[in-house]
A protein has these predicted regions:
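Hydrophobic/aromatic-rich alpha-helical bundle segments in the mid-to-C-terminal region
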Residues: 145-153, 162-214
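Solvent-exposed, amphipathic alpha-helical segments
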Residues: 22, 26-34, 80, 130, ...
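Amphipathic alpha-helical packing segments from all-alpha helical-bundle domains
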Residues: 121-132, 136-166, 176
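Helix-turn-helix
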Residues: 22, 26, 30-68, 72
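N-terminal intrinsically disordered/low-complexity leader segments
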Residues: 1-18, 29, 89-93
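Amphipathic, non-transmembrane alpha-helical scaffold segments
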Residues: 16, 70, 74, 145-153
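Conserved alpha-helical segments that form or flank metal/cofactor-binding pockets of metalloenzymes
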Residues: 64-94
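Hydrophobic alpha-helical connector segments
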Residues: 82-124, 178
Length: 214
């Protein structure tokens, strides 16, 4: 009996992992086009351009495919978009904090929020649609709630230092309130279209909410 080449086994495993991830990401496109209910083995196979047998081989249970696809999306969104954006914001935050000027700090926060929201609506609309589908699915899917909760906790942790610097009485609650406002603005932008709103509507909404936190 011939021995199995270890390199062959490693390469085979790598190809399997790559195809599995490809299928998970293909489910994102199905969700963008047809919503969560559109996720079926055949639809995902067509989006991934793989045989139907591949989707059923890696994900016999369609709910497991949905769950893992959404968990991967949450992880990659935070790593590839949210975290890098806030990492760049830290340098700006450090400069504004050193100035010890509350008005400048408030203005800097609003500027940052406008850039963040406008960028998501104008340049990352599909990603935003997926994110809202993810949140909606978690309402009726306990398996997704931990991932949603972790995403929320990470977002609060990134925003909280700004409100600590502004010396608000409850920086964590302030962060949650501001995140709720951000989501409301994003949802309005998705429904109505970011470019159809009046100029400065995002800035006005963020400024109003920031003043309400005092």
């Amino acid at each position: 009996m011939s021995e199995i080449n270890p390199t062959y086994m490693v390469n085979r495993q790598a190809r399997g992992d790559e195809r599995r991830l490809h299928i998970l990401r293909a489910a994102w496109q199905v969700i963008i086009n047809d919503g969560i209910r559109g996720v079926r083995h055949r639809a995902v196979a067509e989006a991934a351009d793989v045989p139907l047998a591949s989707t059923t081989y890696y994900f016999r249970d369609i709910q497991a495919l949905i769950n893992e696809s959404m968990e991967l999306f949450a992880q990659e969104t935070f790593q590839n978009f949210t975290e890098p954006f806030w990492a760049e914001a830290e340098a700006k935050f450090a400069t504004l904090k050193a100035a010890e000027n509350r008005q400048l700090l408030e203005q800097g926060f609003v500027d940052l929020g406008v850039d963040y929201i406008h960028g998501r609506l104008a340049d990352h609309r599909d990603q935003l649609v997926l994110e809202y589908a993810f949140w909606h699915a978690a309402v009726n899917n306990p398996a997704l709630r931990d991932a949603v909760g972790e995403l929320l906790r990470r977002s609060v942790a990134l925003m909280k230092p700004w409100f600590e610097a502004l010396e608000l009485s409850d920086p964590e609650q302030a962060s949650r309130c501001m995140l709720a406002t951000v989501r409301r603005i994003e949802y309005e932008g998705l429904i109505a279209g970011v470019m159809t709103q009046r100029p400065n509507w995002i800035r006005e909404a963020l400024t109003y909410q920031l003043k309400a936190l005092w």
